[in-house]
């Protein structure tokens, strides 16, 4: 059976990018108040998840290393690319830096070990 596809044209009126530098969840746990005493400097947090986007501008400075324990990328231990996005999100929630390009994490000066 042949079907006809009808496309409705659209026009972009305006483009809006809304980014909260300090996400609501970070505010809700009062992290900005804790930053008066510590932003996580000297602390390493291991992220055991789906990997991490090591080129992400909010994370690349925080990542000190990692290890791939999966069969992804032919099991290469030093390649821990995130093909899912969840591990990158978790890493950002924990330690995204406050660089004005995205959001800030709970401990923006902590180091990340991606597992």
Indicate residue ranges for each PLM-predicted region.
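Active-site core segment of subtilase-fold serine proteases
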Residues: 3-111
């Amino acid at each position: 059976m042949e079907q006809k596809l009808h496309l409705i044209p659209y026009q972009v009126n305006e483009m809006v990018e809304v980014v909260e530098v300090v996400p609501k969840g970070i505010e809700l746990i009062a992290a900005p108040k804790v930053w008066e005493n510590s932003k996580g400097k000297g602390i390493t947090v291991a992220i055991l998840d789906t990997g991490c986007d090591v080129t992400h501008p909010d994370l690349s400075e925080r990542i000190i290393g990692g290890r791939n324990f999966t069969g992804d990328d032919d099991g290469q231990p030093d390649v821990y690319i995130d093909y899912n996005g969840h591990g990158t999100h978790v890493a950002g929630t924990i330690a995204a830096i406050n660089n004005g390009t995205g959001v800030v994490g709970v401990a923006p000066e902590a180091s990340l070990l991606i597992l």
